[in-house]
Structures are given as C-alpha cells and as structure tokens.
C-alpha cells in the first residue's frame, strides 16, 4: 500500500466508530529522565487513569462493537487492555492511530503548535513558526488505517483527543470519554 493521503472521494463504507480517549497518563518518570518527542509516548497511565479505564471497561456500549482497535501509544494501549479484558473484544494495535504530530520538541512548542492548529482551523500556514500535522493529514491517516476494518460495522477505537476531534465536534474530550459517530471509510 502506498503511503500518502487517502483519496477522500473514494470512500464508501459506513462504519460506527465508538471513539474512546485514553486514560490520564503519568509522565513523571519520563520527565525526570528528560525524555522528549515519541519518548513521551512511553508514559503509562496514572493511578487515576487506571481507575478511569476500569470504569470505562464496564460501559455497556463497548460490548456492541465487534473489535477494538488501539493506538500503539502506551497510554492508549494500557486503556485498551482494561476494555478487552472486560469485554472479550479482539484487539488490534495500529501505529497510525498515534497522537497528532508536532515536528518540534518541547512542551512549549507543542502548546504553541496546538494553539496555531486551532487558530488556523487545522491548516498549516506557509509562514508557521512551528511545523505540525494538519487536520487533513490526520484525517487521511485515520481513514487509511481504518480501511483495513471495513468488514466490521462497529469498532471501538482507543486513541487521542486531537485525532478524535477530526471526526467529532466536541471542543473538550475528557480522559476515557466515549463518543459515538459514523464515519465513511
């Protein structure tokens, strides 16, 4: 399969997605060791995040799915582990469901990029001081990934806020929040 943007005009299969944002992460150990970039994606859930995931796993809506697809990022995968243990859903791990990419390191750059992203409605302006993944790139990455699951009608997707926001209007998405939507794949 060639990498690149999915042709959004060639979609056709409707899929019910039950989006779940991962539980609250604990970055303390990684920050103490000065991890940056994708190194921060190794953060496990905090104790609160584990409680959130345990509560989430009892949500009856999740049992209506046929499969759970999770981001490979630790906080999402740990959240997914609670759900699959309780529901018995088969689990697939997808590296393309990772968090939104900012091509600069540091929390300050991430926050600046997030503000620019929101201010520019997901576009990357030519004169942007920080490079980041656009809304169109994120949406395309998600659709490319989910095309593998077209045979399923209902899929739980454990992922990240910025990725979820490309498909749902929610301004704020809490840890372990569940949001249903229909997506054309």
Annotate each PLM feature.
Residues 16-92, 177-179:
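Active-site-proximal alpha-helix that buttresses catalytic centers in soluble enzyme cores
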Residues 17, 66, 153-161:
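Generic beta-sheet signal
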Residues 29-30, 34, 39-44, 85-141:
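Phosphate-handling substructures
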Residues 70-74, 96, 158-162:
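Short, well-ordered beta-to-alpha junction loops that form the rim of enzyme active sites
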Residues 26, 76-77, 100-101, 163-165:
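Short, active-site-adjacent cap segments at secondary-structure transitions
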Residues 138-150:
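A short, acidic, amphipathic alpha-helical segment used as a generic capping/interface helix at domain edges
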Residues 7-16, 59, 92, 96-115, ...:
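Acidic, low-complexity terminal tails and accessory targeting/binding regions
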């Amino acid at each position: 399969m060639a990498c690149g943007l999915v042709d959004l005009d060639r979609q056709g299969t409707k899929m019910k997605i039950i989006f779940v944002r991962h539980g609250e992460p604990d970055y303390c150990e990684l920050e103490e060791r000065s991890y940056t970039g994708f190194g921060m994606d190794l953060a496990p859930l905090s104790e609160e995040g584990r409680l959130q995931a345990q509560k989430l796993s009892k949500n009856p809506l999740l049992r209506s799915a046929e499969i759970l697809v999770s981001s490979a990022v630790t906080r999402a995968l740990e959240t997914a582990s609670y759900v699959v243990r309780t529901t018995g859903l088969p689990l697939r791990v997808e590296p393309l469901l990772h968090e939104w990419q900012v091509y600069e390191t540091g929390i300050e750059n991430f926050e600046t990029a997030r503000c620019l992203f929101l201010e520019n409605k997901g576009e990357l302006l030519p004169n942007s001081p920080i490079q980041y993944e656009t809304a169109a790139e994120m949406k395309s990455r998600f659709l490319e990934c989910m095309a593998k699951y077209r045979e399923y009608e209902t899929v739980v997707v454990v992922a990240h806020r910025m990725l979820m926001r490309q498909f749902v209007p929610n301004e704020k998405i809490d840890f372990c929040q569940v949001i249903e939507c229909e997506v054309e794949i």
